[in-house]
């Protein structure tokens, strides 16, 4: 078990220290609160990531027609230059 670079011996020491500091009655309550906090942070992180993805998708949709139009314009301009060069 290796979570965040912390192995089993380190986790055991942390749990023993928490038990000594907070006592057996307070530890389950703290664990419950920690779980709620982590769940809330994960939810906020997912919402933030979804918003970023949505903005990126909207931006891609907005840029696509411009890119296609720019490519077509560049092709037309290149054809004009080629035809002018071939006439000379």
From Swiss-Prot:
Main location as per UniProt: membrane
GO CC terms in record: TAT protein transport complex
Its membrane topology: Single-pass membrane protein
Subcellular location(s) of the protein: Cell inner membrane
Ranges for region Disordered: 56-88
Keywords annotated in UniProt: Cell inner membrane, Cell membrane, Membrane, Protein transport, Translocation, Transmembrane, Transmembrane helix, Transport
Disulfide bonds: none
Membrane-spanning ranges: 3-23
GO biological process: protein transport by the Tat complex
Composition skew (Basic and acidic residues), residue ranges: 77-88
Keyword Iron-sulfur: no
UniProt biased composition (Polar residues): 67-76
Recorded GO MF terms: protein transmembrane transporter activity
Assembly information from the UniProt record: Forms a complex with TatC.
HAMAP family documented for this protein: TatA_E
Biological role: Part of the twin-arginine translocation (Tat) system that transports large folded proteins containing a characteristic twin-arginine motif in their signal peptide across membranes. TatA could form the protein-conducting channel of the Tat system.
Family the entry assigns: Belongs to the TatA/E family.
Name assigned to this protein: Sec-independent protein translocase protein TatA
Species name: Prochlorococcus marinus (strain AS9601)
Lineage: Bacteria, Bacillati, Cyanobacteriota, Cyanophyceae, Synechococcales
Gene that this polypeptide is encoded by: tatA
């Amino acid at each position: 078990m290796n979570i965040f670079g912390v192995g089993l011996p380190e986790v055991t020491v942390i749990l023993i220290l928490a038990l000594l500091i907070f006592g057996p009655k307070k530890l389950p309550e703290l664990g419950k609160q920690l779980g709620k906090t982590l769940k809330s942070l994960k939810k906020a992180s997912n919402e933030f990531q979804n918003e970023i993805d949505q903005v990126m998708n909207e931006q891609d949709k907005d840029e696509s027609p411009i890119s296609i139009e720019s490519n077509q314009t560049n092709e037309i301009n290149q054809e004009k230059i080629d035809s002018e060069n071939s006439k000379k």
